[in-house]
A protein has these predicted regions:
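Acetyl-CoA-dependent GNAT
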Residues: 10, 20, 24-30, 35-113, ...
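Conserved catalytic-core motifs of GNAT/GCN5-like acyltransferases
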Residues: 140-143, 155, 160-179
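A generic "structured core" feature
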Residues: 115-117, 125, 144, 148-151, ...
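Short Asp/Glu-rich motifs
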Residues: 76, 150, 173-174
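N-terminal amphipathic/basic-hydrophobic helices that include classical n-h-c signal peptides
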Residues: 1-16
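Terminal substrate-recognition subdomain of acyl/acetyltransferases
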Residues: 13, 177-188
Length: 188
């Protein structure tokens, strides 16, 4: 049985009174997750990757149908965590255990207009809480060296580079790499 991360509620975000909730995704969130992840992927990789590669990744990984299946938390994946404000998904992320004591952040994206508000940190905290409850002592994430949005975010939260590997979905001879970042987690 997966541990349910607690729901965090915040008011007074930015200038107005808004209600922000961090929670496990529900089937009704699939379209919003797809929208946020597609927008985040495009914003992150525009000018770094070819437009056709960007759209191919979005079509494969961020299609609402796929996300609906993933909300059910298949083996190795703990399900999606969402940031919802006024019934709108504004951020989403998820991870899973890759081996005993070792967790991975597989995805974390926000509406690009909402970066810098602490929402990504809240999603990461919820994923981390979920993984610690499952016994994680290490937390890993793959980030491409050109990802000038993701790298500073993870460095600021204690992740350090521990190597590199071929970028997900590419062959080693293509030369595309992802940095492997890790931070140690305190047991619960």
């Amino acid at each position: 049985m997966l541990a349910q991360p607690r729901a965090f509620t915040f008011a007074n975000i930015e200038a107005g009174m808004r209600n922000l909730v961090i929670r496990r995704a529900e089937t009704r969130d699939a379209e919003g997750i797809a929208r946020v992840c597609a927008a985040g992927w495009r914003d992150t990789y525009r000018g770094i990757k070819e437009p056709d590669r960007i759209e191919a990744v979005i079509a494969e990984y961020y299609a609402p149908e796929r996300i609906r299946r993933e909300i059910a938390a298949p083996e190795g994946w703990d399900g999606w965590i969402v940031a919802v404000e006024e019934e709108t998904v504004i951020g989403a992320g998820g991870g899973g255990m890759t081996e005993p004591g070792v967790a991975e952040i597989f995805v974390l994206y926000l509406d690009p207009t909402r970066r810098g508000e602490g929402i990504g940190t809240l999603i990461l905290d919820a994923i981390t809480e979920q993984q610690r409850a499952r016994g994680a002592r290490e937390q890993w994430v793959s980030v491409e060296p050109e990802n000038t949005k993701g790298l500073p975010f993870y460095y600021a939260r204690g992740f350090e580079v521990h190597g590199q590997r071929p970028e997900w979905g590419t062959a080693p001879e293509e030369g595309h790499v992802s940095l492997r970042l890790m931070r140690r987690l305190q047991p619960q």
